[in-house]
C-alpha cells in the first residue's frame, strides 16, 4: 500500500524535506536539488500552493513560524515558484525586513548613502508592488540622502494614511498577500493560460535569507551561464557586480558597474580577482548540468569572500541553441538520445535550417518611411 505524503503550508528546504514541484513549484524543488548537491544555498522556506491561495483571501500562515529559521532581524527576498517557470509569476520583492533600525545599523557598515539607497529601493518596491501606489510618486533621486528618505516616507504616509511598516512580520505578511492576489488576478491568469497553464494553476513562494555586502571581505552579486544563449556553444557568459551595487539592481549582462567573469582585455574579471571563487562557480555549474540534466543560469553572491548560490533556472535560449544543447547533453551521456530528440521544438528546426540575423546585433537604419 502506497503511503501518502502530507505537505504543510511552510517547509524549510532541506535535503530530506517533503517537496514537490506540483505542490511547491519548480523553483522550490530546484533549490532543494541544489541543497542535495551540497551547494551553499541560503536558508530558504517554501510556501505551498494551498498556503499561497489561502493568503490571497486573507488567511496568512503563521508569521512567527515562517520567520523562525532566519533568526533575529533578517532581511529576506520573496520570489515566485510556479509549477512551470514559463508560466511566470509576480515580481520578486527584496530586502523585506528593512526598517529604521536596520538602516541605522547598515550605515555603520557601508555608509549613509549606500544604506539609504537600499532602504529607498525597498520602500519604492513595497509602495508600488505591495501597496499598489503610483510609481511616479516614488522616484529615487540620483543622490540618496536622509532628506530623500524622509520625503519618500512622507509620501507613503500621505497616500496610505499610515506610516511605513517597521515590523518585519507585517511587511512579510503584506508581501505574501500582494503576490498571492497578483497571481489570482484576471490579467495574470490569461497570460499564463496563453502559455499553456491550466486556469487553476497554483503558485508557490520561496522566502530566502538575503546575503548582504556588510563583511570586511569581498561582497557582491552575479549571474553566470556556461553556454551561449544564441548559438548553444560552450561559453561562460555573465557579469558580477561588486559590493553594494549588487543589492541595488537586478544583475544582467549590460549592468552598469559590472565586471567580467572570465579574463577579458577590456577590464577586470572575477577570474583575475577571485580565482578560487571563480573555480568554485565553474565546478558548481558542471554539477548543475549533470545532476539537473540541463543548461542552467546560476545566480550567486559573494558574502565576505564566501560563495553562495541563490538560484538556478533553466537557461533561456534560441531555437538554434536548443538543438545544440540537446545534442551536447546526449553526447555527454547526461540525457538519452531519445530524450534529446523530444526536447527539440519543431519550430527550432525551421530556425536552424534558415539563415538568421543575430538578435543581439546592432542594426543601422538606412531608410525610413510610411505607407498607406
Residues covered by each model-derived region:
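Nucleotide/phosphate-binding sheet-loop regions of phosphoryl- and nucleotidyl-transfer enzymes
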Residues: 1-370
